[in-house]
Amino acid sequence: MPEQDKDPRVQENPDDQRTVPEVTGDARSAFWPLRDNGGPSPFVPRPGPLQTDLHAQSSEIRYNHTSQTSWTSSSTKRNAISSSYSSTGGLPGLKQRRGPASSRCQLTLSYSKTVSEDRPQAVSSGHTRCEKGADTAPGQTIAPTGGSPRSQDSRPRRRKIPLLPRRRGEPLMLPPPLELGYRVTAEDLHLEKETAFQRINSALHVEDKAIPDCRPSRPSHTLSSLATGASGGPPVSKAPTMDAQQDRPKSQDSLGLLAPLASAAEVPSTAPVSGKKHRPPGPLFSSSDPLPATSYHSRDTAQVTSLIPATFTAASRDAGMRRTRSAPAAATAAPPPSTLNNTSGSLLNAVDGGPSHFLASATAAARAQRSEVRYNQRSQTSRTRSCLKRNASSSSSSHSSTEGLQELKRRRGPASSHCQLAHSSSNTVSEDGPQAVSSGHRCENKAGTAPGQTLAPRGGSPRSQASRPHINSALYVEDKAISDCRPSRPSHTLSSLATGASGGPPVSKAPTMDAQQDRPKSQDCLGLVAPLASAAEVPSTAPVSGKKHRPPGPLFSSSDPLPATSSHSRDSAQVTSLIPATFTAASRDAGMRRTRPGTSAPAAAAAALPPSTLNPTSGSLLNAVDGGPSHFLASATAAARAQRSEVRYNQRSQTSRTRSCLKRNASSSSHSSTEGLQELKRRRGPASSHCQLAHSSSNTVSEDGPQAVSSGHRCENKAGTAPGQTLAPRGGYPRSQASRPRINSALHVEDKAISDCRPSRPSHTLSSLATGASGGPPVSKAPTMDAQQDRPKSQDCLGLLAPLASAAEVSSTAPVSGKKHRPPGPLFSSSDPLPATSSHSGDSAQDTSLIPAPFTPASRDAGIRRMFRVRNCLRGLGLFLLVFSFFFLLTWASFSF
């Protein structure tokens, strides 16, 4: 056996994967390979007699194994081993037994090959298993590639002469080459699967006869399949048309459980209730939802038409829907019946119900969207007086009259088509989100509709909050600002930007003047931005200098949080934009000219600004529109304040030509008496009411902060009042420093610049930007030329702002020379360091007096140069230490080694 293992007589051909079994005993092989390189080669016979005295069992094993491999060979070369070692006994009987069914033995070839090398008995057992496998599945045959297995009659007959001689010692006669078989490939298995599928399809072909035509079936098909869940037979659609019903056999219905549903669906509905169109199902019913066992019988999606009996045609249904409209234009709004979806259910549950097995969240969302679509369609078709009739549930007093609205629509012309555009786009956009509902419902009054209330639609029947959860939540955000079909006021945009809630898209702004006068001023319900809305409601006619009121721009954004003190951090320079419409620029100039000494015309009192708009502590009317919180960008704030400062300074310096407060008091005591103050009030007339209001509020506000105190005591002369001295108020009794610690500290900052009640220079805007402190809203002043000449120039105490002060002092005489006050430019920003007394700067115009004169730019440059020298010295010292440490380490390393 070991010698035979080393003998390379046993070879394997890679082409047909044939293995030559081992030969036991001393028998020699009659063949040798044509090449010795191990490549694929046939065996050729060796000269000499063949030893035929082999064991019968070995001969049988060799025959069984070679007969298996010969059938799977694809080459045309002859198999010499099987022909030479096969015995004549039992060969015809084996061929007859194998027959056509022997092709199934090829499946176990891989197993028999591997086992045959170790145990030759496994080959015979595997071959026996293959022979028995041909009879295991009667009636089933494997379809080969050619289409049918080869039978014995199709092969050429083998010779009946025995191949091997019966006597020993005679030479072996080689038989003719055997006819090779074929392999079972993946294509054969695929054909077998296709055959099985065809058999199944042929069985299902009987069921396909139940479908009469390609027209849509009723939605009750989906309802029945959903109701049963796992029905044995598919529900069949009923009654698409009259003639089709007559031709169709009536014995197709096999679901007895759905008989009541089918009978209910057969009953024709006389007309759609309240003229509603069939809702599109939205995302509730989609093809991605899992269907029951009978889901493969689903028909086309446009199957709703077949639910209506033949006598109830689409034309009659459209006519009924047109009768329920309020205008003939409703006929065009009805979609064609073929676009309706069958998956929305039958007439029993098509509108709002939906199957019970769907999720509640999806059902609520789908209902909300369907309600939006129907609601938009009704509002689209009801064009007659749709924007005039107001909902009874909303506040009717907060809306403008219908006559004013019609007049506005006639004046506005093509711009009034905004409602139509919103309605036309609401049908498509409403599928995306609740925001689109706001555009569709713009013509309806929804003010005051809380989430817990009910909304009365146009159809007349109220829908509860449970049936419209998303619509009411979306409308509640919007009903605070939108009240009619006209473009909403600028307060809508301001409020949405200030609060950060953009419930509805902002609409175009600024309707005409008379339309605004007709509109009540109580329409705004957003508490935080109510002053904003009322301020933006009144259009500013234009400042005297001809400049338009600037748009909010980037100052108002929904991403900026509003600080808690934002209502008191504005500049009183914003009064220009808050002038009512009837208060024109001409009347204001006339009033300012008539209120000078010697005049007390009644028109001046009417033309004067309202006291509430002048008081810095009055709230958001002074600081809501233009100032912006302190955290807004400094560049935008500086530009806005500079423009307003120029406008006010130019107009006040031009109109205040009469020397209202000519007398100056350098000793700071002339204006402290009550007589001088009364004389000043008599000269200034009604325009001096600002000082009175400030005084009346100073007693209460002075306890809250020094900012209000400074504005309250503005008409008193406080120059020269040191922190340690006492201040004599109007009451006549002195107040000590201990009783008024914060007041004196605030007045000490203020008394260097304020000497009368006239408007101060426009440098207050520059200084307030430089200090960055908005402690109290400064009140604008405007001194004249002679007053500026009389003012001493030694009032400075903030060293850092010396260059700023010099620039502001030069530009203060600009109105006399006809030049406008220059804008501050980028010199002043909120990022500059704040001085210690910045919180006490009640009037931003007073910061000019806080600049010390001795501190020049040259001294500041010298300090910068000293800093550079110190830095260079430190760098040199660090470099020296680094070099020294390097040499020290080098020396230590040299000594250590």
Curated annotation (Swiss-Prot):
Compositionally skewed regions (Basic and acidic residues) per UniProt: 1-19
- Where does this protein reside within or beyond the cell? Membrane
Q: Does the keyword Transmembrane helix apply?
A: yes
The regions listed as transmembrane in this protein's record are 877-897
Cite the entry's keywords alphabetically: Membrane, Transmembrane, Transmembrane helix
Q: Where is this region: Disordered?
A: 1-177, 211-252, 266-302, 315-348, 362-469, 484-522, 536-612, 642-741, 753-793, 812-856
Its name, as the record gives it, is: Putative POM121-like protein 1-like
What's the source species for this entry? Homo sapiens
